[in-house]
């Protein structure tokens, strides 16, 4: 569904109602307590949802809708559920090769990265996984360690230093490293992205009612989070 309208037309209230209805969803099941007739009864069948809120904090209103299980993820470390996202953590049952391919697409979709930087990024991501004992055809069983964002920064630098590009191209790629990947390692961004484990495993995102507040992240990191979460959910459903 695509919901649009002028300011004040009720878009947010409609979405709040939909989210509340999903979590309080009920289904009819056959009641076997009466052998003389066929009857049905309602049974709670909550449907998890994920709200990515780019501006304001209007969806916190859902906490008044009798959803005690509601989880609000925010960049602020002082919240009950501070946002922690390791992009290199991926669903069990998926091959590493598949995740690397998708993760490169996330980086390129969130940040403008001109060739040949994507090639170096791909090599760097594969390299940090190999440093933790991974092979590209490995299927994730949850037993091996995941690399971190700071490891990617260092590996990207190493891969760049081993190239034979002229100084201008190397300078442009160095700018990509510092402005794109480096932006995910500064101040509060480091606490969000440079972690061993995410707040939730990829599989957990499909089990809870969750709001992710993106307003304070800035455009690039907010785009990165949005694309990453959508990718992890698709990967989980596929795995």
Question: Can you say where each PLM-predicted feature lies in the sequence?
Answer:
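Conserved lysine of the Walker
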Residues: 11
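The conserved Walker
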Residues: 6-7
């Amino acid at each position: 569904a695509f919901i649009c309208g002028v300011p004040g037309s009720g878009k947010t209230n409609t979405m709040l109602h939909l989210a509340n209805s999903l979590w309080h969803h009920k289904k009819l099941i056959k009641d076997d307590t009466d052998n003389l007739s066929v009857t049905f009864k309602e049974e709670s069948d909550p449907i998890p949802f994920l709200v990515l809120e780019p501006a304001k904090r209007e969806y916190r209103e859902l906490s008044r809708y009798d959803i005690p299980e509601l989880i609000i993820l925010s960049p602020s470390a002082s919240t009950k559920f501070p946002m922690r996202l390791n992009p290199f953590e991926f669903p069990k049952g998926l091959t590493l090769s598949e995740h690397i391919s998708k993760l490169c697409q996330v980086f390129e979709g969130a940040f403008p990265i001109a060739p040949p930087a994507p090639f170096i990024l791909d090599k760097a991501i594969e390299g940090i996984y190999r440093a933790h004992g991974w092979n590209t055809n490995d299927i994730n069983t949850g037993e091996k360690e995941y690399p971190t964002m700071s490891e990617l920064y260092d590996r990207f630098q190493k891969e760049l230093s081993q190239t034979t590009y002229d100084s201008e191209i190397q300078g442009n790629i160095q700018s990509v490293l510092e402005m794109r990947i480096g932006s995910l390692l500064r101040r509060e961004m480091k606490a969000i992205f440079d972690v061993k484990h995410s707040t939730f495993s990829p599989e957990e995102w499909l089990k809870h009612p969750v709001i992710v507040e993106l307003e304070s992240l800035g455009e690039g990191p907010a785009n990165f989070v949005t694309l990453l979460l959508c990718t992890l959910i698709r990967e989980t459903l596929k795995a």
